[in-house]
Amino acid sequence: MEAALQGAEKRFTEQLAMFQISLSPEQLRQFRQFYENLIKWNEVMNLTAITEEEDVYTKHFLDSLSIVGLVGPGSFDNLSVIDVGTGAGFPGLPIAIAFPGAQVTLVDSLQKRVGFLQETVKLLGLENVQIYHSRAEDFGRIEAQREHYDIACSRAVARMNVLAEYCIPLVKKGGYFIAYKAERIKEEMAEGKKAAGILGGRVEQVISFQLPGTDYNRTLVQILKEKHTSGKYPRKAGR
């Protein structure tokens, strides 16, 4: 018989229920191990400024899974998802844990972070994750990766037009780029819409919300890939 959930885990499962996500004891164990390994590695390298247990569960894990507000919790089976500029693994690793039927690719430019991600994936026993050490602008120029994914997503700190140039080239025609942003992104959206159009995409919807049970305001921007992206994008670094 499983022990009763307490503290951050109990609140996490209650919050996820509002997204219609239910986790098995094994998945909860994986989130627990992810948290513990994140804190361990964070002592020797800068992975996150958020370290309190409940904050990690809410502002990293729950926030990463808020993508179901656009995709739907039952829609991830057999989807290919790429997380560009994943950092400490957000949103990609929570998506991989919660939706084992999805194939998740993580891309990050820093070898030390890639080392953390590799150890974490092995520790958690995740078989649906691939990790690449690459700059986003270089990865998007690899022919085998272009227009290869159903969904590209990113929580990276960059303006919408920059994220669009890194991510839209990786998305299949008919797929989506989804950006996780803070509450106020109005000033970014004009240039974001323009960039999306040049890259073959169209902003389909923008949803702003509070994470369930918190006062944490978030926005998701969903861009539909309607046309093929010109081979000149993403532009090389420094251009």
Task: Go through the PLM ranges and name each one.
Residues 38, 95, 181, 223:
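Residue-level signal for inorganic ion chemistry
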